[in-house]
Every structure is written in C-alpha cells, then in structure tokens.
C-alpha cells in the first residue's frame, strides 16, 4: 500500500492530462486525412486548406496568451512569467504560414482577409471563440488545453506528416516552414509544458485544462475531417 501511494504522489498532472484526453486524441487521429496522407493521396488543395485553417488559429495564439496572462490571479504569477516566454516563442508564426501559402501558389491575401477560399472554417472559428470565452468567463488556465492539443499533436505526428506531404507534393523546404518547424520546435516546448503542468495542483484548474483539451481535440478533429473531399472520405 505504501509503495502504491508513493507512486501515485509521484505521478504529475501532465501524465493524468495525457490519460484523460487520450480517447479524444485518438478520435481526432481517426480523421480520414491521416489515412489519405499515408496512402499518398494528399493534394496541394488539401495542404493549402490545412495552412488556411492553421493561420486562422495561429494568429490568435499570442492574443490568447496575453488574455490568459491578464486574467490569472497573483498565485499564478509563475505561470504569467512562463506565458511571457511562450509569447516570445510564438509571435509572428502566422506570417510563416502565409509565406508557405504564397510559395504553394495559394492566395495568401484572401487568407489574411478571411475571404473566399481563405475563410476560416466553422470548427476553427468555434475553437477560438471557445478559448476566449473560457479565459474571459470561466478559467483562464483552460488555454493550456489548447496548448496540449496543438503541441502534443505536432510532436506525436507532425514530423511524419510533414515528411509525407513534402515527398508526395514535391514541395521545396520554403513551402513547409510552418509544419516542419513546429514539429521540431515543439519537442522542446512539450518538455517545458510538462514541467509547467506538473506544478498545477488545484483540482478545479486541472479539470478546466482537461475539459478544454477534450473540446479542442474534438473541434480540431472536425476541421481535419473537412480537409478531405466528401467523395474521398467515403472511400476512406
């Protein structure tokens, strides 16, 4: 009994976060686009659609982090300091995406202006709105649910997907700056994130992060499902 209790005490929140969001993560990874990519059926239009939606959530990363930092109580001053580091790392990444779109021949201006083929999808619009709502009206730490989804996914499958897309579409490295850099950068980010999460001890805050992660996994998965044309989804 004593050994079991000691092991429980040594288990940090990050491990619990992984466990309690695993089902939602696996559901997201069942999006047909992953199988299509593995079969060599990825198209340039699909890649451009992904970059478009990436832009529409990445452009909110720094504003969301700033909003979160401003809503934290004094007892989470150490999280506010960590957020400042996150902001420094994340600023300007939406411009990388627009550059990738230009290199691929896409309409970066339409994406920036949220017009025509560059419009935000409903799942991403809802995901961003949900996160702002959680920060403003519920628990600002819920933002770290999104951080887990995006950085955990980058580390878990991002590198392999980036290689497949580059090979199948025969793209130059300068068309892959966002996808490639994030699969590499987030290796360090996830270690930092783990240490940060393991310092969260209040149960209500842990629950807020877990719930947010599950919601974001669902909405991000819905966006991924929309990347594949309906005819290909039926075939998959």
Descriptions of predicted regions:
Residues 3-236:
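Non-heme di-metal
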């Amino acid at each position: 009994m004593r050994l079991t209790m000691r092991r429980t005490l040594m288990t940090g929140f990050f491990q619990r976060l992984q466990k309690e969001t695993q089902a939602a993560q696996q559901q997201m990874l069942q999006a047909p686009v992953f199988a299509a990519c593995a079969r060599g059926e990825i198209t340039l239009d699909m890649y451009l659609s992904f970059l478009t939606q990436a832009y529409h959530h990445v452009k909110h990363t720094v504003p969301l982090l700033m909003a979160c930092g401003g809503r934290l109580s004094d007892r989470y001053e150490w999280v506010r300091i960590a957020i400042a580091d996150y902001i420094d790392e994340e600023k300007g990444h939406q411009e990388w995406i627009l550059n990738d779109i230009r290199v691929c021949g896409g309409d970066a201006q339409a994406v920036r202006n949220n017009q025509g083929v560059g419009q935000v999808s409903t799942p991403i619009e809802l995901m961003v709105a949900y996160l702002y709502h959680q920060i403003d009206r519920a628990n600002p730490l819920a933002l770290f649910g999104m951080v887990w989804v995006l950085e955990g996914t980058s580390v878990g499958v991002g590198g392999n997907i980036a290689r497949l897309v580059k090979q199948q579409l025969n793209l130059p490295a300068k068309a892959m700056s966002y996808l490639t850099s994030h699969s590499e950068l987030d290796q360090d980010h996830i270690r930092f994130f783990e240490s940060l999460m393991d310092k969260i001890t209040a149960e209500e805050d842990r629950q807020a992060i877990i719930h947010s992660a599950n919601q974001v996994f669902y909405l991000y998965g819905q966006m991924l499902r929309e990347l594949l044309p309906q005819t290909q989804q039926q075939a998959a």
